Amino acid sequence: RYATAALGAMDRPADAAPMVARLRAIDGTIDGTAAYLRRTYVDSAAARLMDGIRRAGFH
């Protein structure tokens, strides 16, 4: 999740594509990823990670 978010933050969605596919396999949907992050991190950290993950191409 960190690597996916980092690549998204650097506007490198092509490089993040394999990781986005893995997140889909693990979490199912973007909502599943968001739910995991909200349970695990404080709101501000979860929001920042989700921003990067969305920018990586996970919608």
Please place each PLM-identified region on the residue numbering:
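Alpha-helical protein-protein interaction modules
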Residues: 1-59
